[in-house]
Amino acid sequence: MIKCVNCGAESAGKYCPGCGQEVAPKRMTVRLVFKDSTHKLLHLENPSINTIRQLIMWPGRTAKNYITGARKSLIKPYKFFLSWQTFHVLIFHWLSKNYFSYTNSVNQNNPDDKKELILMQQLIDQNIKYFDYLIPLFFAFFFYLFYRKKTGINFAESLSVSFYWISITLIISIIFMFLSLMYVKLWAVPIVFNIIFLTFASMRFSGSMKLSGAIKGLTAVILSYAVYLTLAVTLILAYVNNFHK
């Protein structure tokens, strides 16, 4: 019998029956430190990686599993969204100057218009953390509006679904932000992939994989982005026109 160095319980096995720690832990080495620090991060059973994998491969089924109670292997929707939204904001602040510089260089407007454009870009950069929260709310609303009768979903459940799926669109956007370092025009490409993903996810969730299902899903997605962009642009223009004349 070996006495556990952590809780003092005795065990004949490899792990302590009281606290679960190794009864005879190995001495620390550089290799062991690296293995311990990367195992949970890179292992497929890591909750974050597992949630991403499931949402990409089975977006409808995964979201439906969560709202029906099968949640053990998944990160909570808001926590998942908050993590990727924070990462998205950091990467946006870091890389947006490259894209804004490009758009300014090809813009042929007069100096006053160019000055206004630069101000709008600064406002977007400063407030992207707030704008990121608008699209999940609008998508949740339209998803609930379009699918509540067919699926029986309520708004809280729709919001959970939205946080999951919008998180995947943020991941797609982050990937293209990095790719834009090689070809700057790729910065604007994610919107296409995001619309396709959200439409497909909506179809899978509702079980409607026919043309009518695609049209319904696409309509909900387009309306979400349209309202989001309209509100965002209106707020920015109102600020520019009223405070920076």
PLM regions: where:
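Membrane-proximal intrinsically disordered regions of secretory-pathway and membrane-system proteins
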Residues: M1-K245
